Amino acid sequence: MSHTFQATNKKVLGVLSISAETKKLEWTPVSGDRAPINVNLANVTNLQATPENSAKIMLKIVAGDDPSTFAFSNRGTMIECRDVLQGLVSRARREASNPPPSATGDGSSTPATATPPPKKEEKKVAMDDKSLLADFQLQQTLLKESKELGKVFAATVIHGGLKPEEFWSIRVHLLRAFALTSNQKKGPYNVLSTIKPTTGSDNTVNVQLTPEKVKDMFDQYPVVQTAYDDNVPRLKESDFWARFFQSRLFKKLRGERITHKDPTDPLMDRYLDDEYDKEAALAAGMPDKVHRFVDIGGNDSQAGSESFGNRPDMTMRAGSSGRDVVSVIKSINRLSERLAQKSEAPLAEKEYGTLALADLQGETGAEYVPLQVRQSDTNGNKKDSDGDVDMTPLDAEACKEYVHSQYDNPVSLASLVHDDYSADYAQAWGNVQGAVNQQKGSWETVQESLMDPKVLNDLLVVHTTTIEFLRHFWHNFQEGSAECSSMANSLAKCIKRIDAAVGEVKDEQQHKLAVGAMASVKTSIHHALKEYDIALRG
Amino acid sequence: MTSQFKNSINDYLEGLPEAVLTRLYQSPATCLAVFRLLPALARTLIMGMIFNPDPIAVADVDALVKPSSQRLKLETQKKLRLLHIFTETQAHIIINPTFKKNLRAALVGGDQNISFGVPCDTEDKHKVDVAFLDAHAVSQWEMILHFMVGTSIGRTPSDGVLNLLKHSGLMEPERGGLRITNAGFQFLLQDVNAQIWTLLLQYLNMSEYLQMDPVDVLNFIFMLGSLELGQDYSLSALSETQKHMLEDLRDYGIVYQRKASSRRFYPTRLATTLTSETAALRTASQSMEAATQDTISSSVAADSGFIILETNFRLYAYTESPLQIAVLNLFVNLKTRFANMVTGQINRDSVRFALSNGITAEQIITYLSVHAHPRMKGMEHVLPPTVVDQIKLWQLEMDRIRATDGYLFSEFKNFDEYKDVSTYAKELGVLLYENPGKRKFVSTLAGSQQIVEFVKRRNQKHRSSAN
Amino acid sequence: MNAIDGTSRQLKDTEDQTLDDTPSLLSIIIDAHVPSWEEIKSQISISEAVASILVFINAHLALHNSNSVNVIGYNASGARILYPPKSGVESTRSKEREERSESVSDGEQAPSKKDHSMYRQFKTVDEVVQTELWNMLNHTNYVEEEKQHNSAISGALSLALGFINKHVFVDESRMRARILLLTVGHKNETIQYIPTMNCIFAAQKLKIPVDVCKLGPGSDQVFLQQACDSTHGIYMDISEKNSKTPKGLVQYLLSGFISDPSLRPHIVLPTQSNVDFRAACFLTKQVVDIGYVCSVCLCIMSQIPSNRRCPTCDTTYSEKTLAGLGRKPLKKKKKKVVKP
């Protein structure tokens, strides 16, 4: 991208052209008398312009030994030229001192494939069992977070004598999940979307800017960095930002469409050009206009073709209006990709593929694991008191006889009304009513036997601790660990605890209910201890 | 039967004395019909008792019903008591033995009773089919309705019918003819089943006056409800009263007899669906349409509505029947008529016209939803809620002002006096309106007397204390 | 203005004291296994039972004029829908019947057409049911002994559920459905557990109560009780085994089993089921307190199976896992005898 200005050098009219790519300034005379002047902008040491009030409009460029002076027809042109030169000179000088990064750096990442940037070395939280168990702080936080867990911990460890390692040893999965969730951090986001210029009281526009935001902006939009570096030594920072946020450049970077109503800013608008957007330039490697004659695919597409009636969608329009919109969308996409790469857990190629939209691919059915279940007929039957099943042989003849005799002497419906049956009917009614009464009775006893909530709470705590100890006991029992004996002791203590809790209930009826409620837990403790005894002896 | 008519038949039956009811229960068909009118809990209880020789204990019934459904139990017991099916002693409930015996007979058969009608065993030389019966029923019934609405179709109903209409308050005599009343308008909007029951109940009421045995009448009505369509029945099963009734019922289109001297009669669809669900019934005009078109099977035509109501209050009715158009005209502003359709709009004026004739918003809404087109019925709300709400609002508009007669008390000497008297009125609960600023208030007519006395007493007290 | 709100946004009052008057569909499943009936013939004869069932069907139809009924019969060879009959079948069967009735002089049957004392609707249903049921009984295929012990309850239940599904859900009629299972039960009867349980679960999901009336000494009480319990049905065992008698069947049916689905929330059901919900081992069939559970099919075992395979789903367990289960706690030098 080059800028051209009409300038006069030593009273000869010519064209001054400045190229951003090659960082060169070239002046060619209109009429070929004089030799052209080439200046490498990196070598420019000094740049001077005639002051405002002076009659002359001249620009002096010092590059190395000989200064060149150019005169302009109007001040505006000169100012423009001066600005361009300033920017380019400072950039050229910077680039000269820091060799530019290799060409394969930023530009090579095309939108289709994402090459994951190097993993950021971060303090990773160890996720293995040992470190989790040792991390007391994590455990404390988890206990504070979850009240339920805290209660159980208090009851078993603090009051009950269970060792904390035991407690956590069966809850490692909870610790791990908690550690993972608490380590999650918020990733990078498009900082420009957070900057919202607000209109102040007397028509001034305020913008919140923090150094982090500035840093983020430079990170995400190298153009801004370039503009800043070019201009800030000269302009005041506040001025720069002020102009930036009002410029079309800002709008373009945000992805908003630039209308002709927006104010133009000669300084900032320079950066609108595509030369500053390397990626866009690379992405737009295709030629602008493909001859319709050649572009068969483009002609065929339903969306683009107007023969189907409606004007194609905004993103599908050919020509410059379409391009603007598409470029906006593309730049936002590129930005999102860049942000995703910068995040801490970059995606592997396979995972990236799963992000792609698949709703047109059709539904994949659920995959079930088939179970080969054997069809044993009387499965699930509990044996009552009967022993084996005995098969009495079937007398087919007797059956046939019976059916025929019945068929020939059917019972009419009216005969059911006969008095002979009255006793049976009365008895039947009695039985049915008995069943109703029984059901009602059991229903009512359920209603009455409600436990007082406070009693219930206390019993629940004791119950939970007991279950906890039982769990540990069985865990150790199966493992064959040495802890078993202490667990057996703890179980004995549990029984004492239960009895104490039940004993505290004063009210007769509640006491009975409490005893009934705790009966099954006590049975399980006894059972466990019996198994332990057998194991020890045998 | 719609619940309205269940209730009215129930009321009528409950009004009968026990002896009459017992005679009524001698017919199994009646027992069955009355049984079906009862609430569900009653039916269950009765079934358990038909074969049971002993009476059941009250405690048993109490145990059967959950405590949360006590109200249900009480209502059921009350109803059964009123109908004299149950008699309650201290601890036992005894079922009416006649009812028990005959309901059992209905279930079990075999006792050669004729309450379910006796089909003819000889062939009819002039046999008629179901389509003919439907057409006949429809034409008879519509004749009556057309007469009420005032559209002239050439024939007028018989004198018996006219008499009935007059006595039931559906039409009133005016200038030599008959004019439809408000009740008549409401009648028009009901569905056929309800309409028939209205007339039959009226007939029942008149029957006592005409010295016909109401038991016979009811028995016959309930028997009709249990007959089979398309089967001819012999007159041998009917009593004299019932034979007499047959003539009147012929005029309504409920039964068909080829001529007055025939020894057989056919019940029409109007008869067989007397005691069944409304869904099974087609409206009269639909039957006629179906009969003339001769294409649709009965089940499909059964729920063919024809009204489409839009949210912008426009109405499209796919009908050609002059009766239906006349009915719609009562509350819809009909604008255009096409070959198979009429269109119109429901607006405030049309609804007010209907309301002023005594039709309620509920009736309009029910009529519209019953005759809604099947496409409308498939939607979540059959009628657009906006229209439904607006019709109800228009009805409320009629009630904007409510007038109450009262007495105005004003011109009190001072504020204290005003306060005393108005407080007294408030405590009595007769104060309708007060304006302390102007020291006036209005009380009801009834309460005014007491207030006047209070004032007199108060004045006396003041005068005596002043002296 | 909520009073005139046309949209029905309010939830239905759960304590609705007025019953909805919906018609109901009753599916009766009748045990047509002749040997079983033969065994209890001293207590109740088949024809008496058939008569009682017919009265019950009439009573059901009497409750509401749109009530309908579905009758299914089952025996060792399978299950069949008896009512409503397939069209065309009706005429042939009734012809057969008439031929039979002409040859045998039974005064009760012949004038069936002339008996007008029963409500017509009842009469037609009764006749068809009778014909079809006797057909099934008469034409029973008495096959080999072993197969006689199968009973096709699961088939009958599936037929009933299919019928209900078609007539209530697919046709979208406003009906409630319920199933009544009248079983006699042979004492050696075997029922296919898994298909029947599947049917029960389906009935549970569709909110169809399954009632059971047990007339004879068949086994599997527990499993039928479970069926009633999960679907909120009524279970009544009126067999002699339960010290009752199936005589007076009609009264049992009319008082215990007559209640409509819409009435059931309001009354106490006369059910006799006391389901034992305790877990039982699949191998030894004993009740189990502490045991092993297969991680694939969740079947319960009280001991490690000898062939290292799960009895139901046939998965093999690895040696390592099984060895791990058999570990015992280490013995300490000092034996601490714990007194509970």
UniProtKB/Swiss-Prot annotation, chain B:
Entry superkingdom: Eukaryota
Cellular localization per UniProt: Nucleus
A Gene Ontology term for the protein's cellular component: transcription factor TFIIH holo complex
Gene3D superfamilies: 3.30.70.2610
Any one Gene Ontology BP term: transcription initiation at RNA polymerase II promoter
InterPro entries: Tfb2_C, TFIIH_p52/Tfb2
Disulfide bonds: none
GO molecular function annotations of the record: ATPase activator activity; double-stranded DNA binding; RNA polymerase II general transcription initiation factor activity
Presence of keyword Cell membrane: no
Predominant subcellular localization, coarse grouping: nucleus
Record's keyword terms, sorted: DNA damage, DNA repair, Nucleus, Transcription, Transcription regulation
Keyword Nucleus on entry: yes
Complex and partners: Component of the 7-subunit TFIIH core complex composed of XPB/SSL2, XPD/RAD3, SSL1, TFB1, TFB2, TFB4 and TFB5, which is active in NER. The core complex associates with the 3-subunit CTD-kinase module TFIIK composed of CCL1, KIN28 and TFB3 to form the 10-subunit holoenzyme (holo-TFIIH) active in transcription.
Assigned protein family: Belongs to the TFB2 family.
Job description of the protein: Component of the general transcription and DNA repair factor IIH (TFIIH) core complex, which is involved in general and transcription-coupled nucleotide excision repair (NER) of damaged DNA and, when complexed to TFIIK, in RNA transcription by RNA polymerase II. In NER, TFIIH acts by opening DNA around the lesion to allow the excision of the damaged oligonucleotide and its replacement by a new DNA fragment. In transcription, TFIIH has an essential role in transcription initiation.
Protein name: General transcription and DNA repair factor IIH subunit TFB2
Species annotation: Yarrowia lipolytica (strain CLIB 122 / E 150)
Organism taxonomic ancestry: Eukaryota, Fungi, Dikarya, Ascomycota, Saccharomycotina
Name of the coding gene: TFB2
From Swiss-Prot, chain C:
InterPro entries, per the entry: TFIIH_Tfb4/GTF2H3 (IPR004600), vWFA_dom_sf (IPR036465)
GO molecular function annotation: zinc ion binding
Region named Disordered: 85-117
Record's subcellular location: Nucleus
Biased amino acid composition, Basic and acidic residues: 92-103
Tagged with keyword Transcription: yes
GO cellular component, one term: transcription factor TFIIH holo complex
Signal peptide start-end: none
Disulfide bond sites: none
Keywords: DNA damage, DNA repair, Metal-binding, Nucleus, Transcription, Transcription regulation, Zinc, Zinc-finger
Alphabetical GO biological process terms: nucleotide-excision repair; regulation of DNA-templated transcription; transcription initiation at RNA polymerase II promoter
Zinc finger (C4-type): 294-313
Function: Component of the general transcription and DNA repair factor IIH (TFIIH) core complex, which is involved in general and transcription-coupled nucleotide excision repair (NER) of damaged DNA and, when complexed to TFIIK, in RNA transcription by RNA polymerase II. In NER, TFIIH acts by opening DNA around the lesion to allow the excision of the damaged oligonucleotide and its replacement by a new DNA fragment. In transcription, TFIIH has an essential role in transcription initiation.
Similarity annotation: Belongs to the TFB4 family.
Summary of subunit composition and partner proteins: Component of the 7-subunit TFIIH core complex composed of XPB/SSL2, XPD/RAD3, SSL1, TFB1, TFB2, TFB4 and TFB5, which is active in NER. The core complex associates with the 3-subunit CTD-kinase module TFIIK composed of CCL1, KIN28 and TFB3 to form the 10-subunit holoenzyme (holo-TFIIH) active in transcription.
Protein name, as recorded: General transcription and DNA repair factor IIH subunit TFB4
GN (gene name): TFB4
